[in-house]
Swiss-Prot record:
It comes from Mycobacterium avium. Homotetramer. Keywords: Cell wall, Fatty acid biosynthesis, Fatty acid metabolism, Lipid biosynthesis, Lipid metabolism, NADP, Oxidoreductase, Secreted. Pathway: Lipid metabolism; mycolic acid biosynthesis. Its main location: secreted. Its EC number is 1.1.1.100. This is 3-oxoacyl-[acyl-carrier-protein] reductase MabA.
Length: 255
């Protein structure tokens, strides 16, 4: 009876119809450190062809690197051309590059506000527009934005950062409505309080205060973010579009 049950289970799994794995050409912007690096390494370990952008630091071992400033259209085009020559047109774009320049609203200059929007939101638009050309032709594409709980909750002193991250959600949903019929989807992974160079630089009072809102009562690690990205990049996620997946220990509770 045990053998029969095992055999039936195996047959059921085989008949389930899960799509076969396909190795894709992946580009992770800002993939040379922190969350971006963890994502790039995870996707490379899964046998995808992975390239990362950096701003002069070079690529980590095992990854193909291209220098790129996402605030510069010409630099974006050059980076994509290099990636295309190395591993083919980008099929999975992980838009992760970004900056933060926090300040009280009344002290935040327009220059500081605009600088963050340009890097985090307009930069994402630039790389998306460039990637979408070949994705539409191939009728396959996965666009994954690395957002933030800040873009859903709003966090004090981050009017610029929160606005940019919230904008990614609207952009992903607009793109999904426009391009899903061509096999191109856009989704957002929204990390919460993750241990990175950026969060370590925050005031200790802010770090301590953040834990009060996290049911898990701990800071997340960069290694806990790539799983959601891997899923959205996979064949299994073909019918998911315009979604926001929080990776925040329950901090935002889906807001």
């Amino acid at each position: 009876m045990t053998d029969t049950a095992t055999e039936n289970t195996t047959e059921s799994a085989a008949d389930y119809g899960r799509p076969a794995f396909v190795s894709r050409s992946v580009l992770v912007t800002g993939g040379n450190r922190g969350i971006g690096l963890a994502i790039a390494q995870r996707l490379a370990a899964e046998a995808h062809k992975v390239a990362v952008t950096h701003r002069g630091s070079g690529a980590p071992d095992g990854l193909f690197g291209v220098e790129c400033d996402v605030t510069d259209n010409d630099a974006v085009d050059r980076a994509f051309t290099e990636v295309e020559e190395h591993q083919g047109p980008v099929e999975v774009l992980v838009s992760n590059a970004g900056i933060s320049k926090d300040a009280f609203l009344i002290r935040m200059t327009e220059e500081r506000f605009t600088e963050v929007i340009n890097a985090n939101l307009t930069g994402a638009f630039r790389v998306t527009q460039r990637a979408a050309r070949s994705m539409q032709k191939k009728r396959f594409g996965r666009i994954i934005y690395i957002g933030s709980v800040s873009g859903m909750w709003g966090i004090g002193n981050q009017a610029n950062y929160a606005a940019a991250k919230a904008g990614l959600i609207g952009m992903a949903r607009s793109i999904s409505r426009e391009l899903s019929k061509a096999g191109v989807t856009a989704n957002v992974v929204a990390p919460g309080y993750i241990d990175t160079e950026m969060t370590r630089a925050l005031d200790e009072r802010i770090q301590a205060g953040a834990l009060e809102f996290i049911p898990a009562k701990r800071v997340g690690t960069a290694a806990e973010v790539p799983g959601a990205v891997s899923f959205l990049a996979s064949e299994d996620a073909s019918y998911i579009a315009g979604a926001v997946i929080p990776v925040d220990g329950g901090m935002g509770m889906g807001h």
